[in-house]
């Protein structure tokens, strides 16, 4: 038995060790975008709060069902002793004998009709639960989108730093060549000085890019609630997809995306749920003018004796309880006549609430329609910009390679070489920015078409 426990302990230690190695390896190679999303969802305080709200909604639905279809049952007991002149519980006459009574009772009641309030409450609780689930999904989507944007910022400035670093190395080599050409009399001191200034300017841009990368990383860590001891490392191996103009959706496909979003988007479903609940509340308020019908009943019994009364022998406890059983059943009908106009005021308020909810639902539909159309337009616009940025980068690379050869041969000045370097840097940076924007906008369109952000990766 002891050996078996020892083996189990060894297996557990091995399992924990392997898990730690796997986690360490994952952190070492950097977290992917999906890893960052999953981590942010796991640590999000906002999501934990919403999950608790959904659990409250489930409890409210259960309570509404039980309140509508089950009675309320109570049981109780009490005991008392009477002194002096009081009513004799055995003969129902007055005497000066001290008595002791112990009573028991069980009662229950159920509302048979209260203007369909119980039924409407069940429907309201069901809709509220649906709204809570949709709100939870909306929070998840917002966290994933914010994480994606922050992740793209880190990727952009990380790769921009790499691009600028490459230009710095190129300018260092150009400066070395310019000094050598100065020694050979092929270039003047002004060209060398200009190359040194260009190198210093590029090194300054590198520092700016690195600082922005550090700031973007802090923002991503804060968004993810990063709690690890080591600094967050992300996987920069992003998709280098090229854009093709034939990827544009047709008008029919755009209409399908819009229709799907209007029918399934959490924001619209939540607004519709609020409108439906407001309508049910209005119905309940109208039925408040109807009578209420309730049914109740109960069973009671008691035991009594005369302590200190000489020669009195009380009946056995069980026999007394059986003999003294009393039962009742009550059917109650209540008509509302005057309640200080509270029912009328409540009805007006519920009407106003329904008007507001209906207007908010219409607003949500218009906003979503505008967001979807803008998302499709942004995706197509950034796609066209990416297509042009890729062509521009290719041309600038050819020009850059040609200018490097000219600079080595002393055919262009340091100023022309600097301009070519800046043009290439801008082309690469704008192509990288266009690619990340296009990927982000494309993900938003996919989201509106029913694919959650985290499932896209």
Identify the residue ranges that each predicted region occupies.
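Short flexible linkers and secondary-structure junctions
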Residues: 29-153, 293, 297, 341-344, ...
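A short glycine-centered flexible hinge/capping loop motif at secondary-structure junctions
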Residues: 182-186, 407-411, 448
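Bacterial N-terminal signal peptides
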Residues: 13-25
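Bacterial Sec-pathway N-terminal export signals of envelope proteins
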Residues: 18, 28-72, 228, 234-279, ...
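Periplasmic alpha-helical coiled-coil/stalk elements that build and connect Gram-negative outer-membrane
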Residues: 2-4, 142-260, 378, 382, ...
């Amino acid at each position: 038995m002891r050996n078996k426990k020892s083996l189990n302990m060894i297996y557990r230690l091995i399992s924990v060790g392997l898990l730690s190695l796997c986690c360490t390896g994952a952190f070492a190679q950097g977290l992917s975008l999906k890893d960052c999303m999953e981590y942010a969802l796991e640590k999000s305080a906002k999501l934990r709060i919403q999950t608790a709200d959904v659990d409250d909604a489930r409890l409210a639905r259960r309570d509404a069902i039980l309140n509508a279809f089950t009675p309320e049952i109570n049981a109780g007991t009490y005991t008392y002793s009477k002194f002096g002149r009081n009513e004799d519980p055995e003969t129902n006459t007055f005497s000066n004998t001290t008595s002791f009574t112990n009573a028991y009772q069980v009662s229950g009641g159920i509302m048979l009709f209260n203007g369909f309030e119980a039924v409407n409450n069940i429907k309201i609780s069901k809709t509220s639960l649906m709204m809570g689930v949709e709100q939870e999904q909306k929070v998840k989507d917002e966290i994933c989108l914010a994480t994606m944007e922050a992740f793209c910022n880190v990727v952009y400035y990380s790769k921009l730093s790499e691009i600028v670093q490459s230009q710095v190395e190129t300018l260092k080599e150009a400066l070395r060549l310019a000094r050598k050409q100065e020694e050979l009399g092929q270039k003047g001191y002004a060209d060398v000085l200009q190359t040194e200034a260009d190198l210093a300017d590029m090194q300054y841009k590198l520092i700016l890019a690195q600082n922005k990368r550090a700031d973007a990383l802090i923002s991503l860590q804060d968004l993810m609630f990063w709690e690890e001891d080591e600094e967050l490392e992300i996987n920069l191996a992003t998709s280098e997809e090229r854009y093709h103009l034939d990827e544009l959706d047709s008008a029919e496909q755009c209409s399908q995306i819009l229709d799907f979003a209007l029918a399934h988007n959490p924001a619209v479903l939540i607004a519709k749920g609020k409108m439906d609940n407001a309508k049910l509340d209005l119905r309940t308020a109208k039925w408040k003018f109807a009578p209420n019908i309730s049914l109740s009943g109960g069973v009671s019994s008691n035991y009594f004796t005369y302590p200190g009364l000489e020669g009195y022998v009380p009946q056995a406890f069980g026999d007394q309880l059986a003999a003294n059983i009393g039962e009742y059943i009550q059917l109650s009908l209540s008509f509302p006549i005057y309640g200080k106009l509270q029912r009328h005021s409540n009805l007006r308020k519920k009407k106003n609430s329904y008007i507001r909810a209906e207007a908010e639902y219409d607003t949500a539909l218009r906003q979503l329609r505008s967001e979807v159309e803008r998302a499709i337009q942004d995706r197509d616009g950034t796609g066209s910009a990416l297509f042009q940025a890729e062509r521009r980068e290719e041309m600038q690379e050819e020009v850059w390679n040609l200018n490097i050869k000219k600079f080595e041969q002393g055919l262009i000045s340091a100023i022309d070489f600097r301009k070519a370097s800046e043009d290439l840097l801008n082309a690469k940076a704008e192509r990288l920015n266009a690619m990340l924007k296009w990927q982000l906008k494309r993900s938003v369109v996919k989201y509106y078409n029913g694919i959650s952000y985290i499932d896209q990766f």
